[in-house]
Regions:
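Long, basic/Gly/Ser/Thr-rich N-terminal segments
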Residues: 1-57, 240
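Conserved lysine of the Walker
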Residues: 76
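Hydrophobic anchor at the beta1->P-loop junction of P-loop NTPases
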Residues: 68
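Small-molecule kinase domains that catalyze NTP-dependent phosphoryl transfer to phosphate-bearing small molecules
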Residues: 190-230, 242-245
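Glycine-rich phosphate-binding loop used to anchor ATP phosphates in small-molecule kinases
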Residues: 120-165
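Walker A (P-loop) phosphate-binding loop of P-loop NTPases
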Residues: 73
Length: 245
């Protein structure tokens, strides 16, 4: 035991405790973003919610994912582009044929015959389209895609689109008469123009969509703006009662 200090002697002051470091709070987790853009969710796109029963669905202001199906010469790319350009809300248009032709060297042209290479490049293009669509939708931008989807060919079927975009994708078939697609095909140039026999064969296979339950628009006698307005009507019904596919 240390000796007591003599009378009148004050003990030395106790030094103050060293300051404690400020508590470090972890920064809030950044959203899944690239710059200020939201990346698509890991899951597929869900079906758009129908508005209350008392109000009619308005496809012109709803964020949608649409797949416009049709044979060569059906006008699906022209209609999809017009529809996207004239909506009052942000809307993107993605044509699978355009994406497939991003491959410059080594492009597997389906006109040269359907083989493993053309199938692989088709699958890749479809997957790329699906990711792009989900990316647009994640940022509040609707998307319309167009592709010649065959009802009798699993690899070129709706299943792949459903996997890559999601069950919220709304498919619509554009199917004018054979004489119309032959006439439109004759106006094409480059590798987008097909032989008449091939156009007729594709058109015949597309007839398999009848009875599928998907909405079908016969635009044989319709111009592009009228077809786009009819597409809005079809989509309004699809939002209210989504087709089973």
């Amino acid at each position: 035991m240390p000796p007591a200090p003599p009378p009148g002697h004050q003990a030395p002051p106790i030094p103050p405790a060293p300051p404690q470091p400020a508590a470090v709070h972890p920064a809030p987790a950044a959203p899944d973003a690239t710059g200020h853009l939201r990346l698509p969710a890991a899951g597929p796109v869900t079906a758009p919610s129908a508005p209350p029963a008392r109000s009619a669905p308005d496809p012109t202001t709803t964020t949608l994912a649409v797949l416009l199906i049709g044979p060569a010469g059906a006008g699906k790319t022209s209609v999809a582009k017009h529809w996207a350009e004239h909506r009052p809300v942000p809307t993107a248009h993605i044509s699978l044929d355009d994406v497939r032709e991003w491959v410059r060297s080594g492009f597997a042209d389906p006109q040269a015959g359907w083989n493993d290479d053309s199938e692989t490049q088709y699958r890749l293009a479809r997957r790329t389209c699906g990711f792009a669509a989900r990316n647009f939708l994640a940022n509040g931008i609707s998307c319309i895609l167009d592709d010649a989807v065959f009802p009798d060919r699993p690899v070129i079927g709706l299943g792949g689109w459903k996997r890559h975009v999601g069950p919220g994708l709304l498919p619509v078939v554009l199917l004018p008469g054979l004489d119309v697609v032959l006439e439109r095909n004759a106006e094409r140039t480059g590798n987008r123009r097909l032989a008449d026999e091939e156009v007729a064969r594709i058109h015949g296979r597309m007839a398999g969509w009848y009875g599928s339950g998907l909405p079908i628009i016969d635009n044989s006698q319709l111009d592009i703006p009228t077809t786009a307005r009819l597409l809005d009507e079809v989509l309004a019904r699809a939002i209210a009662s989504p087709p089973s596919w």
